[in-house]
Amino acid sequence: MVPGPNTLFVLKNSVSSGMKGGYLAACGVFIGDAVLMFLAWAGVATLIKTTPILFNIVRYLGAFYLLYLESKILYATLKGKNNEAKSDEPQYGAIFKRALILSLTNPKAILFYVSFFVQFIDVNAPHTGISFFILATTLELVSFCYLSFLIISGAFVTQYIRTKKKLAKVGNSLIGLMFVGFAARLATLQS
C-alpha cells in the first residue's frame, strides 16, 4: 500500500473526528474501491485508461476535488476552528461522502486495478467472476487492516494533540499542503 490521498484523508479524519470519523472515511474508500474494482473487471476502467478524453475528465475531477478538500482544511485551520470530534451527524455523513468521491475520482486507483487484475485473472477461463471476487475481497481485507492501523494510530495521536493546539494547526496545514501536492501530481498524470 502506497500512501495517497485516500490514506491521508482517512488519517486526517481519524485525528480530527476520532475513530468513528476515521472508519466512516474508510467505508467511503472501501465502497469507492469496490466500485473501481468492479469497473476494472467489467472493462469500464480499461475504457477510461485507453480513452484520453475520459481519462482526462477523471484526472481533472480528482485534482479539483483534492484542491477543494485542501481549501476546506486550510480555511478551517486559518479560521482557528476547533478540529476536535463533534457529535453532529451531518459532519459524519460529509466525511463518508467526501471519502467516496475522493476514491472514485482517483485515476491512479483506476490504473492500479486495471493493471493488477489483468495479471491475476485469466479472462479466457470460465467463471472469472469468482476469481475477481476472491481477489477483490483479499484486497479489501488488506486495505481494512492497513486503514484500521492508521485509524487507531490517528485516534491515539488525537489524545496527544488535544492539549497542543498549535501542533494541531501545523498538522492540518501540512495535510492541506499534501493535498495540493497530490492534486498537482494527479493533474500531470499520464494514462
Curated annotation (Swiss-Prot):
Gene Ontology MF terms in the entry: antiporter activity; L-leucine transmembrane transporter activity
Transmembrane segments: 28-48, 50-70, 101-121, 132-152, 167-187
InterPro entries according to UniProt: LeuE-type
Annotated Gene Ontology cellular component terms: plasma membrane
Keywords (A to Z) from UniProt: Amino-acid transport, Antiport, Cell inner membrane, Cell membrane, Membrane, Transmembrane, Transmembrane helix, Transport
Localization: Cell inner membrane
Catalytic activity: L-leucine(in) + H(+)(out) = L-leucine(out) + H(+)(in)
Keyword Disulfide bond: no
Pfam family, one: LysE
Chief location bin: membrane
GO biological process: L-leucine transport
Membrane topology: Multi-pass membrane protein
Functional summary from the UniProt entry: Exporter of leucine.
Family per record: Belongs to the Rht family.
Name the UniProt record assigns to this protein: Putative leucine efflux protein
Record lineage: Bacteria, Pseudomonadati, Pseudomonadota, Gammaproteobacteria, Enterobacterales
Name of the encoding gene: leuE
